[in-house]
Amino acid sequence: YEISLGLVGSEMCIRDSSMTRIPAEDEAVTAPSPPLDNALAQLSAAVKTLGYDEGLHQMLAAPRREMAVSIPLRRDDGSTEVLRGYRVQHNFSRGPAKGGVRFSLDVDLDEVRALAMWMTWKCALLDVPYGGAKGGVTIDPRQYSKAELERITRRYTSEIQPIIGPEVDIPAPDVGTDEQTMAWMMDTYSVNVGHTTLGVVTGKPVSLGGSLGRASATSAGVVHVALAALEHLGIEPSQATAAVQGFGKVGAGTVELLEAAGVKVVAVSDQYGAVRDDEGLHYDALQKQLWDTGSVKDTPGTASMDADELLEMDVDLVVPAAVQSVLTEENAPRVRARLVVEGANGPTTGEADRILAEKGVLVVPDILANAGGVIVSYFEWVQANQAYWWSREEVDERLKQRMVAAWKAVLATSESRRVSLREAATLTAVQRVAEAHRT
């Protein structure tokens, strides 16, 4: 069914898609966006391998609920514009929906549908009791003042409030949003319901019920999986070399934690350039250079290098932790690392994936490798519901347990079915959601 509600100064559409079906091949439909096309193709392949019937396939593919809202904004200069926002809840079979809110010009309904589906699989793979959701507003946040972003966030929260809540759908930060955004969302929701509700979002400041360890969780998850994969390959951390593409939140944290684990990080890049030191780079020096100049480029005691060559270095481990589609059909044949751990979302194209598999390069997919943030978001939600907060050591240890358990499950599926880790991760996740639905 569909419901349209006319609101003062706004528009809201809620669509319950539990009965939505995938169009037949001969039906005329609007072509899906590439992310949604990829998500549906991955699901179809998993369903075929698992031998599920078409009815279950339809259930797994269809978003459970979709919402599109109009957000009137009065700019600081007095002008008014109307923005578009979305929230898609893909699946509730394993628990309330969970997923980020992004502020980006790329946000549209098809992208949000795809990201919500991928969140369902990620939560299931990590054995976190959530379904998948995603949301966002179609803006470039750099073009708005802090006051304007607050107004956008608060109005967006009020509009999607009918379908979110600590037992229904729990938003979190994503591209273009941060802990301040989550603080505004939590405050707006709490004011609207009449009481403080810490568990309505995760990724909040620690002072408002956020979890210790949340800021570094994604990087920590990357490193936990990387160390487990190195062990699987028979490589001691103290003997391993690594190259990390990206020195943002994920990349910088990965460099710091790899160094602490004894791995020699010999190359690092950011959007402005790359540096190398075959004797090993040091996180503190890179971070100081970043603070002083805005880039790791020209860090004292290092040599400059072509950033494009970083992914092709003769190292044990490569961590793409910047942007998507950096490992391609063109450069994959030149990759010499034995292990690629995807810290970024979608850094490896399908063509590159096939080439790396043929070369015997082990690729740990993003759905597993960068899932640490989702796990600690779950921990934050649990702590908020209990009104009891864990120590940093407890958070770190429980994160490690979850990441290693997920790695072992994916590896076991990969070996038993003789498929790549990426295929194994999707199969494991889809199977868990299907079992929950059918139980």
Give short role names for the model-derived ranges.
Residues 210-312:
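Glycine-rich phosphate/diphosphate-binding loop of Rossmann-like nucleotide-binding domains
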Residues 273-363:
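Rossmann-like adenosine-cofactor binding region
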Residues 1-14:
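Short, small-residue-biased leader/transition segments that mark boundaries at the very start
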Residues 69-141:
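Glycine-rich, N-terminal phosphate-binding loop and its surrounding beta-alpha-beta segment
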Residues 30, 229-230, 334-439:
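Adenosine-phosphate binding glycine-rich loop
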Residues 30-70:
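Short, Gly/Pro- and small/polar-rich lid/capping loops
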